[in-house]
């Protein structure tokens, strides 16, 4: 109802927006929007027997971390450490992480019988990276797996989606090429440098778990709020 009440005034304002913006910057006529982000840990309870367990956060200090190496570290975690700890040992149907060039990242599992053990595995991912010391052959296999994901043939829709993402993000082609070169030249030392980023995300990020009510209540101290879906 509030939206319906304000809609006429908004549409009227929209009609004059382009005229007011002519000859100047859009920032001169736009009201600045600042979103205040507050970390919150939520447990969302359902009748399900399993959980979807996620942590999302940001590393504010990315100094010393090569952006292209993030793809290699992600591949290493997804198909190595997390696969073994959360899928094989923990029994989850799936698990993954994402490490993004701006310092943001997340860990997530689905159809996961675990909760606290999964969160602990996320937090220990940094230790795994920090102690990474694989033989050159193993590292080469990881690099090949990473670069093959980047070079997978894409249908027109996927090419368009990628191009749109690059355009909206204003990422120059030179930066993408530099990151690709960093993937190919990745070393064990480069991988170990990503540990601080993984630690920041897992230790200071927000937790969100959707799943079994009893399991969530057993771990209620992890959450700021509990909701019933």
What are these model-derived regions, one by one?
Residues 1-87, 229:
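His/Glu-based metal-binding/catalytic segments typifying zinc-dependent metallopeptidases
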Residues 12, 16, 124-131, 193, ...:
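A generic structural signal for well-ordered alpha-helical segments enriched in polar/charged residues
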Residues 1, 50-72, 78-188, 203-211:
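M16 family metallopeptidases and their MPP-like homologs
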Residues 6-15, 120-125, 222-223:
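Short amphipathic alpha-helices in soluble, non-transmembrane regions
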Residues 185-229:
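In a subset of proteins, long, contiguous C-terminal domains/tails are tracked
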Residues 41-44, 82-83, 93-96, 192-198:
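Generic recognition of flexible, low-complexity loop/linker segments
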């Amino acid at each position: 109802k509030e939206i319906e009440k304000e809609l006429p005034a908004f549409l009227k304002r929209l009609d004059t927006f382009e005229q007011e913006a002519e000859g100047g910057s859009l920032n001169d006529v736009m009201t600045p929007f600042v979103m205040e982000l507050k970390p919150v840990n939520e447990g969302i309870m359902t009748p399900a027997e399993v959980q979807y367990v996620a942590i999302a956060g940001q590393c504010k200090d990315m100094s010393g971390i090569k952006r292209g190496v993030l793809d290699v570290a992600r591949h290493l975690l997804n198909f190595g450490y997390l696969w073994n700890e959360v899928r094989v040992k923990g029994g989850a149907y799936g698990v993954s992480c994402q490490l993004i060039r701006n310092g943001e990242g997340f860990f997530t599992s689905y159809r996961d019988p675990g909760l606290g053990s999964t969160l602990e595995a996320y937090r220990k991912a940094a230790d795994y990276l920090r102690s990474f010391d694989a033989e050159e052959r193993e590292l080469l296999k990881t690099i090949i797996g990473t670069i093959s994901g980047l070079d997978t043939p894409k249908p027109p829709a996927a090419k368009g989606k990628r191009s749109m993402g690059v355009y909206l993000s204003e990422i120059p082609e030179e930066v993408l090429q530099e990151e690709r070169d960093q993937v190919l030249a990745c070393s064990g030392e480069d991988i170990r440098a990503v540990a601080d980023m993984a630690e920041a995300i897992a230790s200071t990020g927000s937790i969100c778990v959707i799943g079994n009510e009893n399991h969530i209540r057993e771990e209620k101290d992890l959450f700021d709020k509990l909701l019933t879906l």
